[in-house]
């Protein structure tokens, strides 16, 4: 097994980590501040340059929460220092995206345009300069929220399996099916 929870979580000088009495972890960095409630049964030891998560017993529940707690804190540290970014590509004739103020306006082959207002913690932009397909860029410091917003945009028109038209992640491979063949 990986035993990922036993590894210490390093953080740099620009990051400050604090924990209150209810196991609410607050991490501040150059890009912002994130707060997360960690399971109260886990204990957190904060040193000068790292955090260690400890579990009370070796029960299955505690082992799983141990790794989860560590992963959540690692994602928070990475978010406040580097941030997260997801890119989506819009493929299809007449499929377009553009920003109007804070709202993302997308034409995806429906009879009406779709207006998507992202949460305030996430920045959404459109890059139309990379060839013929528009690219939607979702950025933020909260990994879960960035992934959730990107998945919601993708779900507006998922790639269809015959021509691959729709919204997909830039690095996503969509396997295409063969069409019908004529009878002989």
UniProtKB/Swiss-Prot annotation:
Q: Which GO terms describe its molecular function?
A: rRNA binding; structural constituent of ribosome
Kindly provide the name given to this protein in its UniProt entry. Answer: Large ribosomal subunit protein uL6
Q: Which organism is it from?
A: Salinibacter ruber (strain DSM 13855 / M31)
**InterPro entries recorded:** Ribosomal_uL6-like (IPR000702), Ribosomal_uL6-like_a/b-dom_sf (IPR036789), Ribosomal_uL6_a/b-dom (IPR020040), Ribosomal_uL6_bac-type (IPR019906), Ribosomal_uL6_CS (IPR002358)
Q: Which gene encodes it?
A: rplF
Question: Which SUPFAM superfamilies does the entry mention?
Answer: Ribosomal protein L6
Q: Which family does it belong to?
A: Belongs to the universal ribosomal protein uL6 family.
On the tree of life, the source organism's domain of life is Bacteria
Record flagged with keyword Flavoprotein: no
Q: Which GO terms describe its biological process?
A: cytoplasmic translation
Q: Which Pfam families match?
A: Ribosomal_L6
Gene3D superfamilies from the entry? Answer: Ribosomal protein L6, alpha-beta domain (3.90.930.12)
GO cellular component, as recorded: cytosolic large ribosomal subunit
**What is known about what this protein does?**
This protein binds to the 23S rRNA, and is important in its secondary structure. It is located near the subunit interface in the base of the L7/L12 stalk, and near the tRNA binding site of the peptidyltransferase center.
Kindly indicate where the leader peptide sits in this chain: none
Key words, A-Z: Ribonucleoprotein, Ribosomal protein, RNA-binding, rRNA-binding
Describe its partners and assembly state.
Part of the 50S ribosomal subunit.
């Amino acid at each position: 097994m990986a035993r990922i929870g036993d590894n210490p979580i390093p953080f740099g000088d620009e990051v400050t980590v604090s924990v209150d009495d209810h196991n609410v972890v607050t991490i501040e960095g150059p890009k912002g501040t994130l707060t997360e409630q960690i399971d109260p049964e886990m204990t957190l030891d904060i040193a000068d340059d790292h955090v260690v998560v400890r579990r009370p017993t070796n029960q299955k529940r505690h082992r799983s929460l141990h790794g989860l707690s560590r992963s959540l804190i690692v994602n928070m540290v990475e978010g406040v220092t580097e941030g997260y970014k997801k890119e989506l590509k819009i493929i299809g004739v007449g499929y377009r995206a553009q920003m109007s103020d804070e709202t993302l306006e997308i034409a995806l082959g429906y009879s009406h345009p779709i207006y998507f207002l992202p949460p305030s913690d996430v920045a959404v932009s459109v890059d139309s300069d990379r060839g013929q397909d528009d690219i939607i860029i979702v950025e933020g410091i909260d990994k879960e929220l960035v992934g959730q917003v990107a998945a919601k945009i993708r779900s507006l028109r998922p790639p269809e399996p015959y021509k691959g038209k729709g919204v997909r992640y830039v690095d996503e491979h969509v396997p295409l099916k063969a069409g019908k063949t004529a009878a002989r």
